Amino acid sequence: MGVLNEFKAFAVKGNVVDMAVGIIIGAAFGKIVSSFVGDVIMPPLGLLIGGVDFSDLAITLKAAEGDVPAVVLAYGKFIQTVIDFVIVAFAIFMGVKAINKLKREEAVAPTTPPVPSAEETLLTEIRDLLKTQNQNRLP
């Protein structure tokens, strides 16, 4: 039972749960960006450069023979993937930049010193009284 309890404690830690949520949201965000690039950005871009469908751009290295498919370099799909990456990287950069700005604002905000406890206040008063007594005794 010890291993099971240790795993349970590990799995419910904030960092592990936060990481899992981040991975799930990141995967969903990646799908959204892929659709945005493939369905929204690339068609008008292809139209502007002469009606080219980027996903069909490829160099055939060896033609198909019978049941053997053609060997191609699908550089159009690669271009779409690069654009996906650039958009995701930019979105992550902007998110990290916003988080860092919030952290800097929190760090700059002045913190009020904690109110001393009654015991600390009493000890401070005793210390001050002893200092004044010692100063009065010295010639």
UniProtKB/Swiss-Prot annotation:
Matching InterPro entries: Mechanosensitive_channel_CS, MS_channel, MSC/AndL, MscL_channel
Q: Where in the cell is it found?
A: Cell inner membrane
| Keywords on record | Cell inner membrane, Cell membrane, Ion channel, Ion transport, Membrane, Transmembrane, Transmembrane helix, Transport
The way this protein sits in the membrane is described as: Multi-pass membrane protein
* Record bears the keyword DNA-binding: no
Please provide, in alphabetical order, the Gene Ontology terms of the cellular component aspect for this entry: plasma membrane
Keyword Ion transport in the entry? The reply is yes
Positions of transmembrane segments: 9-29, 79-99
Matching Gene3D superfamilies, A to Z? Large-conductance mechanosensitive channel, MscL, domain 1
Q: Which GO terms describe its molecular function?
A: mechanosensitive monoatomic ion channel activity
One Pfam family of this chain: MscL
Q: Which family does it belong to?
A: Belongs to the MscL family.
Its biological purpose: Channel that opens in response to stretch forces in the membrane lipid bilayer. May participate in the regulation of osmotic pressure changes within the cell.
Question: How is this protein organized at the quaternary level?
Answer: Homopentamer.
> Protein name, please?
Large-conductance mechanosensitive channel
What is the organism of origin for this protein? Pseudomonas putida (strain ATCC 700007 / DSM 6899 / JCM 31910 / BCRC 17059 / LMG 24140 / F1)
